[in-house]
């Protein structure tokens, strides 16, 4: 217990002792008390330590004031409680954020006063936002639960956080927990702040989703879409087909509301995007031929659809792929997505034809 542990001043006088319950027992000279609190007085000298990440750190103590260690109500403050807890658990290594560097100088003095060996310290870089400020809830998600609710997988989040300020020394970005544990070395941790990049985190999460067993992916996707009206009464086989197409492109289950165009009869168009896609006369002419020829197909597969698009492009002297983006906007309402031909096959001829016709019928000049 802490019964015999005492803190002494530079003259060797006891100013504070701790019993087994960590209750403060004030003893010693009144000069160490101010308004009922107890302060730790120390000799003004340089304090230094060899940090496992930042190297040797030192601080001249001529500007440091005596340290309050016990409040007026007798309860210990963070510094003395922290040091005594480390002593009780025989802590040899302390790894924490570098916002505690200033505290470490004070703790070293307390360890010395208590006659305890100084633990080895490793101060990790802080996670910062795009402005270089410490990341906080003002920047958005700040708690692990926030990321879980957004649909981030635990292993992906663990993977990403480990890579903040650290690297394995090779080009690997996706690693299992066991691989991370085996590869991790404090010596490879950078001392500079690490910026949280949500795009990188989402991309990494997408890699994990892409490798998830399909039956698990489908089950979680079904749970995620259940809140949307368009998901009600969906055929299971059709849903599985859509999920199989989109698994490799899904980064978060919270984004599955973007799957709606597969399940609704029509789509809502962003007029700005539609105008951009159909602004050229030759493109509109090509699209008119595409929709006519698609309607005549007896086999609506990727090869047949691709041939229709290619022929229309040649007829109106459009370069390779110039009709792909306009087609995507017309049939999905968006500008990005899974493979266009595979998407159209899943949607089926009726939906593709009706959506293209609807888009071409819009008077864009009036919009």
Predicted regions and their residues:
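Catalytic adenosine-cofactor/nucleotide-binding cores of aminoacyl-tRNA synthetases and other
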Residues: 102, 114-120, 124-269, 332-367
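Active-site cores that bind ATP or allylic diphosphates and position pyrophosphate for catalysis
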Residues: 1-123, 128-135, 143, 168
């Amino acid at each position: 217990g802490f019964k015999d542990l005492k803190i002494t001043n530079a003259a060797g006088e006891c100013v504070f002792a701790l019993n087994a319950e960590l209750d403060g027992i004030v003893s010693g000279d009144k000069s160490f008390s101010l308004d009922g609190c107890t302060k730790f007085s120390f000799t003004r000298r340089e304090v230094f330590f060899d940090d496992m990440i930042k190297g040797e750190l030192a601080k001249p103590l001529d500007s440091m004031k005596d340290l309050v260690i016990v409040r007026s109500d007798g309860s210990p403050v963070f510094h003395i409680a922290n040091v005594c807890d480390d002593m009780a658990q025989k802590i040899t290594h302390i790894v924490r954020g570098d916002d505690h560097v200033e505290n470490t100088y004070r703790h070293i003095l307390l360890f010395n006063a208590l006659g305890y060996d100084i633990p080895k310290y490793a101060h990790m870089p802080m996670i910062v936002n795009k402005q270089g400020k410490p990341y906080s809830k003002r920047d958005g998600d700040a708690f692990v639960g926030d990321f879980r609710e957004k649909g981030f997988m635990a292993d992906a989040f663990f993977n990403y956080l480990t890579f903040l300020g650290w690297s394995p020394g090779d080009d690997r970005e996706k690693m299992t927990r066991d691989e991370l544990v085996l590869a991790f070395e404090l010596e490879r941790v950078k001392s500079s702040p690490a910026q949280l990049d949500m795009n990188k985190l989402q991309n990494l999460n997408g890699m994990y989703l892409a490798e998830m067993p399909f039956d698990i992916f489908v089950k979680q996707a079904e749970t995620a879409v259940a809140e949307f009206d368009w998901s009600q009464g969906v055929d299971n086989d059709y849903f599985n087909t859509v999920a199989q197409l989109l698994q490799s492109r899904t980064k978060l289950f919270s984004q599955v509301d973007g799957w709606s165009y597969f399940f609704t009869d029509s789509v809502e168009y962003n007029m700005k995007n539609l105008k951009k896609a159909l602004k050229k006369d030759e493109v509109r002419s090509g699209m008119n031929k595409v929709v006519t020829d698609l309607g005549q197909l007896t086999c609506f597969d990727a090869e047949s659809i691709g041939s229709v698009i290619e022929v229309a492009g040649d007829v109106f002297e459009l370069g390779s792929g110039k009709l792909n983006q306009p087609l995507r906007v017309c049939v999905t309402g968006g500008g990005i997505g899974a493979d266009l031909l595979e998407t159209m096959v899943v949607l089926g001829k009726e939906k593709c034809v009706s959506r293209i016709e609807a888009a071409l019928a819009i008077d864009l000049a009036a919009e």
